[in-house]
Amino acid sequence: MDAIKCSSSFLHHTKLNTLFSNHTFPKISAPNFKPLFRPISISAKDRRSNEAENIAVVEKPLKSDRFFISDGLPSPFGPTVRDDGVNFSVYSTNSVSATICLISLSDLRQNKVTEEIQLDPSRNRTGHVWHVFLRGDFKDMLYGYRFDGKFSPEEGHYYDSSNILLDPYAKAIISRDEFGVLGPDDNCWPQMACMVPTREEEFDWEGDMHLKLPQKDLVIYEMHVRGFTRHESSKIEFPGTYQGVAEKLDHLKELGINCIELMPCHEFNELEYYSYNTILGDHRVNFWGYSTIGFFSPMIRYASASSNNFAGRAINEFKILVKEAHKRGIEVIMDVVLNHTAEGNEKGPIFSFRGVDNSVYYMLAPKGEFYNYSGCGNTFNCNHPVVRQFILDCLRYWVTEMHVDGFRFDLGSIMSRSSSLWDAANVYGADVEGDLLTTGTPISCPPVIDMISNDPILRGVKLIAEAWDAGGLYQVGMFPHWGIWSEWNGKFRDVVRQFIKGTDGFSGAFAECLCGSPNLYQGGRKPWHSINFICAHDGFTLADLVTYNNKNNLANGEENNDGENHNYSWNCGEEGDFASISVKRLRKRQMRNFFVSLMVSQGVPMIYMGDEYGHTKGGNNNTYCHDNYMNYFRWDKKEEAHSDFFRFCRILIKFRDECESLGLNDFPTAKRLQWHGLAPEIPNWSETSRFVAFSLVDSVKKEIYVAFNTSHLATLVSLPNRPGYRWEPFVDTSKPSPYDCITPDLPERETAMKQYRHFLDANVYPMLSYSSIILLLSPIKDP
């Protein structure tokens, strides 16, 4: 995730905070509710003084008319169904009192609290954990917490008992019913509450198990749940939902995908920075979802329909999506944003972590300011003992309860930064001896990554790091890996983009990329530690990469100041979609060249949603705020392109799957790989070389020959001599469809092959400018 996509989010937090801070739940005053508590005063000591200071009022609990109440247990955290009731447990170090608020779904809509139960510190607190056990009717019941304690931002505390806070461990969070639609009070931050779990019928997994596909064999497809089926051309009953994705999985199966990487599906507020867009005449929203509210809760508004139990519906439909994907041999990886939350900076809304224990969950500077390594206002304190346990519990939950197969960690380098050392010795100016580790300092053996890597449950899942952050930490090739972490290889993207467009000086670096980047992944790591990609949600789509030299982000409402400026793109001679026929032909050729480079490289290829048919966002390389055509998969366009680029992509993915040599478990050696230039076995690695070719021994195909000519000049290539065999064309990106891929079932295949024969009889091949080829060995038949 690029920091720029969040840049506007905390510009609006000041405005939203006013709305949110006034949006509290009034206490019930109706005559049929009798007072629940009898107040008594207590006092607590200030951390910097021995004098007692009366800072809170704790109410002595009485019996509830609705629920049987007992002490409860401090573990596990969150709500847990047991003994015909629910145990609630929440960690809060610095609070002095806690109240659990129970809210019926109907009362939530009316801004009411149904019942409040004050917890007794002598019975309902163990260490720093508040807990209580309740038995009663929890049908359609929600909950939240009030905490009291110091409100002292300069000390890192934001306690305010007027706020009802979300449980960090909540399994489902309820707010608005419909995606992107304001409630009757026009509040962008509506009241939220956590679903109380009940002992319902167990989900039928039908024996579903994790697929555990070898990572070297993966072809990953990065996608957005809502964007995948929201467009009307999807022609499904519930567009923009988990169910919609499940219905369209056969498209991915047809393409050859065996792993989907879901952009954030944790609960987030899509109206976080809701504002009118004067350019498009619609509203800016948080479409991508990189601003989490609840890490255990699936995004509720991705459910197929709202109902009294649409939280449960969302959980079940996410499970159905995973189950249906597994039936088709497709793994599911979640993009998790464990680097910051939606609570923004010091002026942001307070709805969970900040009110529960701000100084624990966030990296704070000595005077309470938020460190902003995420670029989104705050930074999750990942290596604090409590927070890293939270992260571990969260990941375990999604693996064991939701059956996901792995995680991609957004801005994963933040997990390698040191945690806040929040105590008087280093924060409040007390004299200390020696140097202290500055909060956020990169550390070589981060405890949270160590825990994840060696956890017995998580050890077998896919772990992918976006190995950089917005604070300048760039760890591609150097992320703490324990031998199991893969990385989004941003260097692969940049090198391949520059070589394919014909930039001098990249032939050697391009060759490294083709081999799986062994220059980066050393120390026992494998090619599959590199997640190779040309395009992702950040940046240009593949079609825009060959159409625009410059970003076109005016529609984002930030005067084109957001988004990446260094895209290494090339418009092929004319800027924008309206171009000459010759330019459009070259663009299609370049798209094919990029896809060939992705499919013949060692490592794990990743494709961005829509690139398989040439989706365009009109040159916008930062579409985080658009719930419209820019981010919607166009099923009608996919059908139009079915015999063109989609066919090309499908055939190349199938070819990669068939070739044993294109998904190696180890980096290729000279026994298998041979480099060539315009003449066999004479590669040219000079600064001006724009030609790279190699042959690869393959146990299935015997041998394959791949060449890239990124020069503006055509050339004649001499091929390696293989006695008894002839090279035959399989892919030539300079040819129009369907002759760009000569498959056995291609009509007029023999006619097409004859066009090459006189060249191949001479063991040469004519390559046009900006083209790539794949040749296969075929035995010469006796006349």
Curated annotation (Swiss-Prot):
Subcellular location: Plastid, Chloroplast
Protein family according to the UniProt entry: Belongs to the glycosyl hydrolase 13 family.
Organism: Arabidopsis thaliana (Mouse-ear cress)
Subunit record text: Associates with ISA2 to form the heteromultimeric complex Iso1 required for amylopectin synthesis.
Location, primary (coarse class): plastid
Transit peptide location: 1-43
GO terms, biological process: amylopectin biosynthetic process; starch biosynthetic process; starch catabolic process
Name of the protein this chain belongs to: Isoamylase 1, chloroplastic
InterPro entries: GlgX_Isoamylase_N_E_set, Glyco_hydro_13_cat_dom, Glyco_hydro_13_N, Glyco_hydro_b, Glycoside_hydrolase_SF, Ig-like_fold, Ig_E-set, ISOA1-3-like_C
Disruption phenotype: Strong reduction of the starch level in leaves, but 50-fold increase of water-soluble polysaccharides. No alteration of the amylase-to-amylopectin ratio. Absence of starch granules in the hypocotyl endodermis associated with reduced hypocotyl negative gravitropism but normal phototropism, and presence of some starch granules in the root columella, leading to axillary branches with wider branch angles.
GO molecular function list: isoamylase activity
Annotated function: Involved in the trimming of pre-amylopectin chains. Accelerates the crystallization of nascent amylopectin molecules during starch synthesis. ISA1 and ISA2 work exclusively together as a multimeric holoenzyme. ISA1-ISA2 removes preferentially branches that are very close to other branches. Promotes negative gravitropic responses in shoots by facilitating starch granules (statoliths) formation in hypocotyls.
Assigned keywords, A-Z: Carbohydrate metabolism, Chloroplast, Glycosidase, Hydrolase, Plastid, Starch biosynthesis, Transit peptide
Any Pfam family hit: Alpha-amylase
Entry EC number(s): 3.2.1.68
GO annotations of cellular component type: chloroplast; chloroplast isoamylase complex
Positions of the catalytic residues: 410 (nucleophile), 466 (proton donor)
Enzyme class, UniProt record, top EC level: hydrolase
Pathway terms, separated by semicolons: Glycan biosynthesis; starch biosynthesis
Record's miscellaneous remark: In the absence of ISA2, ISA1 may be unstable.
Catalytic activity reported: Hydrolysis of (1->6)-alpha-D-glucosidic branch linkages in glycogen, amylopectin and their beta-limit dextrins
